[in-house]
From Swiss-Prot:
It is a peripheral membrane protein. Catalyzes the conversion of dihydroorotate to orotate with quinone as electron acceptor. Keywords: Cell membrane, Flavoprotein, FMN, Membrane, Oxidoreductase, Pyrimidine biosynthesis. One of its GO terms (molecular function) is dihydroorotate dehydrogenase (quinone) activity. GO terms for biological process: 'de novo' pyrimidine nucleobase biosynthetic process; 'de novo' UMP biosynthetic process. Gene3D superfamilies: Aldolase class I. The active site is at 178 (nucleophile). One of its GO terms (cellular component) is plasma membrane. This is Dihydroorotate dehydrogenase (quinone). FMN binds at residues 65-69, 89, 142, 175, 220, 248, 271, 300, 321-322. It catalyses: (S)-dihydroorotate + a quinone = orotate + a quinol. It is found in: Cell membrane.
């Protein structure tokens, strides 16, 4: 039902400031999840289970991190048919993020530019929100570092967040690829990444012993990587037995949107313009990783065919963000059905 209403809702939402519309949508979905209204409005999405990272996903189409940074609307999003949900990015302490305005639509390109800067209520409130949710499907919890934490101490923030979210996560995503936290992408460098993943794997094993379960780790990377960087990252993932990789985050490139309103705004560009770059990284990763480390593909999915293209490039699962904002819940079912059709041919 909500899928059929979304085009009307979008017309009103797109007249608003992009971030105000985002917050209004989150409040509505959060309220719907708490009251049970979400179930009445739920989208009919067929089950298409698959097992990845040792987890069974209801279907291969998930919600990407960033839409629900505080995990405040998990039940509302769950009713829309996603096969898994990822929330965050969360940091140890609450922080406001970058000054507004910091989110801009580029409808001519099917794109969004954001420079949010990991605005969130902190990991303690995040955990409370996650615990309050009734959703029992696969839930990814995405962690990052505070803006005022020196990059040399970044591991401290990731380790702290990992310990706090571990008992409540199906998997944990290590976000080192946002362009909106100063120097964060330095952690994708070979030496920095090796040290960070070594520390996180050590912590993961100790937490697994403590809680009696191994929660997989996934690394989220940028599309703005050359071939050698992708190879180095793949080798580091294999060396540390990281369970998954998410490709990709937003891009700093503006080649596809030159001349459009807001194109020169600072921040990460998402949506259709990142589709090809994301797929290229997925193909390169898959060539290096094979089936040893599953890939979650995200970036520019606006149709079922787009989702299938991500899988054809080497992804095992996909996530939606900007396409979901433009297309609404109907995109979830379209992607699930298109992937299922491709598997039966």
């Amino acid at each position: 039902m909500f899928s059929s209403l979304y085009p009307l809702a979008r017309a009103s939402l797109f007249k608003m400031d992009a971030e105000d519309a985002h917050h209004l949508t989150l409040r509505m979905l959060g309220a719907a999840g708490r009251t049970g209204l979400a179930r009445a409005l739920s989208s009919r999405v067929p089950d298409a289970p698959r097992t990845v990272m040792g987890l069974t996903f209801r279907n291969p189409v998930g919600l990407a991190a960033g839409l629900d940074k505080d995990g405040a609307a998990i039940d509302g999003f769950a009713a829309l048919g996603f096969g898994f949900i990822e929330v965050g990015t969360v940091t140890p302490r609450a922080q406001p993020g970058n000054p507004r305005p910091r989110m801009f639509r580029l409808p001519e390109a099917g794109a969004i530019i954001n420079r949010m800067g990991f605005n969130n209520s902190g990991v303690d409130q995040f955990v409370k929100n996650v615990q309050a949710a009734r959703y029992r499907g696969v839930l990814g919890l995405n962690i990052g570092k505070n803006a005022d934490t020196p990059i040399e101490r970044a591991a401290d923030d990731y380790l702290y967040c990992l310990e706090r979210v571990y008992p409540f996560a199906s998997y944990v995503t290590i976000n080192i690829s946002s362009p909106n936290t100063k120097n964060l992408r330095q952690l994708q460098g070979a030496g920095e990444l090796d040290a960070l993943l070594a520390a996180l794997k050590n912590k993961q094993q100790r937490l697994a012993d403590l809680h009696g379960k191994l929660v997989p780790l996934a690394l989220k990377i940028a599309p703005d990587l050359d071939d050698e960087q992708v190879k180095d990252i793949a080798a580091t993932l294999l060396r540390h037995n990281i369970e998954g990789v998410i490709a990709t985050n937003t891009t700093l490139s503006r080649d596809a949107v030159k001349g459009l309103p807001h194109a020169d705004e600072a921040g990460g560009l998402s949506g259709r313009p990142v589709f090809d770059a994301s797929n290229a990284v997925i193909r390169k990763l898959h060539a290096e990783l094979g089936d040893a480390v599953p890939i979650i593909g995200v970036g520019g999915i606006f149709s079922g065919d787009d989702a299938r293209a991500k899988l054809a490039a080497g992804a095992s699962l996909v996530q939606l963000y900007t396409g979901f904002i433009y297309r609404g819940p109907a995109l979830v079912a379209e992607c699930v059905k298109a992937i299922a059709r491709g598997q039966t041919r």
